[in-house]
Amino acid sequence: MTERVALVTGGNGGIGTEICRQLSSGGYRVVTTCVNPEAEGVEAWAAALREEGHDIGWVQCNVADFDACARMATEVEAEFGSVDVLVNVAGITRDAFLHKMDADNWRSVIDVNLNSAFNVTRQFVTGMRERGFGRIVNISSVNGQTGQFGQTNYSAAKAGMHGFTMALAKESAPKGVTVNTVSPGYVRTSMTDAIPDKVREAIIGQIPAGRLGEPQDIARAVAFLVADEAGYINGANIPVNGALFCSF
């Protein structure tokens, strides 16, 4: 395989970092996006990964802004080359029961978690089609399948992401482009580490596997889906949730 360029949006979070790490280990030239490099400590993050042997590039971009994504795409392809692999990871939460949720918190979650998939994918899918190869993976959530208290915005966005996946897979398959979803369950990250112990134990008690997922569990699924050999897997939703939710 020639070195393919892989773009991972929001790749400096817990799950995103491991995706970047595993794709880099697999021989991809990995680039990520961040909104506020200074606040997010991206330079220190990238330096730590370089110490491990992973040279991860980064560009500043608000993925909720279509025009910003267009500028980002120009910058990425000028510096790193054509993007053949896209992993849409960027996401936020703004939790509240719907009867208490304000419009800004609804819109911000839909913009970052769902509209960003269009904003970013739109910049690269044409090139993938023209080259006859592309791998797009959208990171959704078990809560997009089950719903969750206080997360009408998040659940709607994550459910919508897989609808986006299925439709785009049908459009793109004739051109050698695959589009798939990975839906994590509860994963051990800094966010879940901050949950009170009793709450975290109650969550784990609901998971048949008896543990939280690890970022590596999600990243391995992504690495599998973006491989050249995975070209016949298209429009799928891969649950990585320890049997918390099972469906067909």
Language model features by range: what are they?
Residues 126, 170-174, 231:
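Alpha-helical segment proximal to the catalytic Tyr-Lys
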Residues 26-43:
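Conserved glycine-rich Rossmann-like NAD(P)H-binding loop of the short-chain dehydrogenase/reductase
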Residues 146-149, 223, 234-248:
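Short C-terminal tail/terminal secondary-structure segment
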Residues 121, 157, 165:
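Active-site helix of classical SDR
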Residues 12-13:
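Conserved glycine-rich cofactor-binding loop
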Residues 141:
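Residue(s) in the substrate-gating loop at a strand-loop-helix junction
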Residues 97-98, 105-110, 192, 203:
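Substrate-binding pocket helix/loop in short-chain dehydrogenase/reductase
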